[in-house]
Regions:
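Transmembrane signal-anchor helices characteristic of membrane glycosylation enzymes that use polyprenol
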Residues: 10-35, 200-209, 276-280
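Membrane-interface coil-to-helix junctions
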Residues: 24-78, 85
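Internal/C-terminal transmembrane anchor helices
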Residues: 262-286
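Soluble catalytic regions of membrane-associated enzymes that act on cell-envelope
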Residues: 281-339
Length: 339
């Protein structure tokens, strides 16, 4: 007997499964990673700070990220909040690809940008607003595909490009790139008008540079904007963007695939293998567990759990000076250092 699952329930179950899987991944690979990130950022509850930040390109996601990160002093909070955002990104990406291609064959590949973003969160120099900006971009693409009129879609895209640059920053470049790819397959003869959005983003970036909001072009147009300015971003920061562009290029070809069960099954299996290989090969490359013990100790310090620090240090080698400092600090707080 065939069991029919209502669509809302199916979406909820898919989101819940993804949420649990991502939460488990974060917990296994670095339970105290997000707690460590919280100690490097401070959210200032001041009207002048909020207003000044909000007026800058990307100010909205920067304020939202700062507000969320303050809850990361509880290790589980950072894991659950980030897993929630990445699960939403996966569902939106799946919905966009399905609505655009007319089939649901690319849902395994929709995990690729999610995995890439998950890797970025283990880099302490990655800015949390990068994930929020990515989510906001997908929201724009979702509504774009709901508009049938070509002219209305372009007007909406123009307005949302300006809105996205103002609220989320350089992610507007990726938004315009994906829009051009989408429209090139939907309306090939009319997609040239979307090239004007490139000029719009360029002018917005130029204005931001004139105002001194950005110091370099790469911070106004590329993914480097979501990496700390103190260090060069490297190629890893461009991974989610590059994967997304490649995914949409492949998605355009999937629009013309014949609906054959054997072919569909083979494509799903191949995509599953690709995602598995990417996760298996990327985890050791982008995730380091060398400092996990130190992150755990700093989290305990942040929460004033001095007895827990002393007990934890009994089970770890004390040749590491950072571990020694944490141990001595706990003893000092307990007034036991001289003893």
């Amino acid at each position: 007997m065939k069991i029919s699952i209502p669509k809302p329930l199916g979406l909820f179950l898919a989101w819940m499964f993804t949420f649990i899987a991502i939460s488990s991944f974060f917990y296994i690979m670095g339970a105290y990673n997000f707690c460590y990130l919280e100690q490097w950022q401070t959210f200032v509850y001041d009207s002048s700070y909020v207003s000044n930040t909000f007026m800058q390109p990307g100010g909205l996601v920067q304020l939202t990220a700062g507000f969320l990160i303050q809850f990361f002093h509880m290790p589980i909070a950072g894991i659950l909040i980030t897993a929630f955002l990445l699960s939403a990104i996966f569902l939106l990406m799946t919905h966009i690809l399905k609505r655009w291609t007319g089939n649901n064959l690319l849902w395994p590949s929709a995990l690729l940008p999610v995995v890439a973003l998950a890797f970025m969160h283990f880099n302490t120099n990655y800015l949390y607003e990068g994930t929020l900006a990515f989510l906001l971009m997908l929201v724009g693409l979702t509504f774009h595909l709901c508009i049938r009129s070509t002219i209305s879609r372009f007007i909406y895209s123009l307005c949302y490009t300006v809105f996205l640059f103002a609220t989320a920053g350089s992610i507007a470049s990726l938004y315009v790139t994906l829009l051009i790819i989408i429209e090139a397959f939907i309306t090939p003869k009319k997609c040239a008008i979307y090239l004007l959005l490139i000029l719009v983003v360029y002018l917005l970036a130029q204005y931001a540079l004139w105002e001194g909001w950005f110091g370099e072009w790469k911070h106004a147009l590329l993914a480097d904007a979501y990496f700390t300015r103190r260090l060069p971003a490297g190629s890893a920061i461009h991974l989610p963007w590059g994967i997304s562009i490649g995914l949409f290029l492949v998605g355009g070809l999937f629009r013309y695939l014949p609906n054959k069960p054997n072919l569909n099954r083979a494509l799903l299996i191949i995509q599953g293998i690709v995602v598995g290989v990417f996760l298996y090969q990327g985890a050791p490359q982008y995730i380091s567990k060398d400092n996990e013990t130190f992150k755990e100790l700093t989290c305990l310090i942040d929460n004033g759990q001095w007895d827990a620090i002393i007990d934890r240090c009994k089970d770890i080698p004390m040749t590491n000076l950072l571990h020694q400092n944490c141990f001595n600090l706990a003893f000092a707080e307990k007034d036991c250092l001289l003893q």
